[in-house]
Amino acid sequence: ERFSISESTRANYARGEDTYDPVLSQAVVFPETNEEVSKILKMCNEHKVPVVPFGTGTSLEGHAVGNQNGITISLEKMNNVLSLNANDFDCRVQANVTRKQLNEYLREDGVFFPIDPGADAALGGMAACSASGTMAVKYGTMRTVVSGLTVVLANGDIIKTGARTKKSSAGYNLTNLFIGSEGTLGIITEVQ
């Protein structure tokens, strides 16, 4: 249930909605926490196993194509809203919460998440790809609305970037370093 080498499961996680030929990874794993992603990446780093993160698979650019010598980490079980501060227009979600799921959650508080790339993408993938959409002129892009991330680095280290404050001049803006990094610097597991 949390680890699969079956061909049918691997085929389901071999590509997104792009036109690239699917590539089956050796296995698909389904972590539920940052710590589980960390353990997986530590092992993969130690044994030099390539990793492909997989959210909802809505990518049109080949981000979700598997690696025949590696594993796919499906974030589908990391789909919870962790906190909401409606008065501050701020929430923290796990990476596989979709924009529609988040907006359903936010509706009763009279707020909404404005980034709409067209597909019902996961917020972790939207951050990794620096998504925008039809309302970007008014509300900005992912780079504008995301104030912090939790990222698991290739060596398994878990880092938190940013803060709940809207303005800060303390230190490097690591949040914007990871937004748009396409998963090359680490796996985004939480978005704030």
Predicted regions and their residues:
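Glycine-rich, histidine-containing beta strand-loop boundary motifs that form or position
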Residues: 53-57, 64, 95, 115-117
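N-terminal flexible segment immediately upstream of the FAD-binding catalytic core
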Residues: 1-42, 58-89
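Generic beta-strand/beta-sheet core signal
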Residues: 6, 54, 74-76, 116, ...
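FAD-binding subdomain of flavoenzyme oxidoreductases
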Residues: 80-84, 91-192
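Feature of Fe-S/electron-transfer and energy-metabolism proteins
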Residues: 9-12, 30-36, 43-46, 60, ...
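Short, basic and Ser/Thr-rich N-terminal targeting/leader segments
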Residues: 45-47, 54-56, 121, 145
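Residue-level detector of anion-binding/catalytic polar loops
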Residues: 49-50, 112
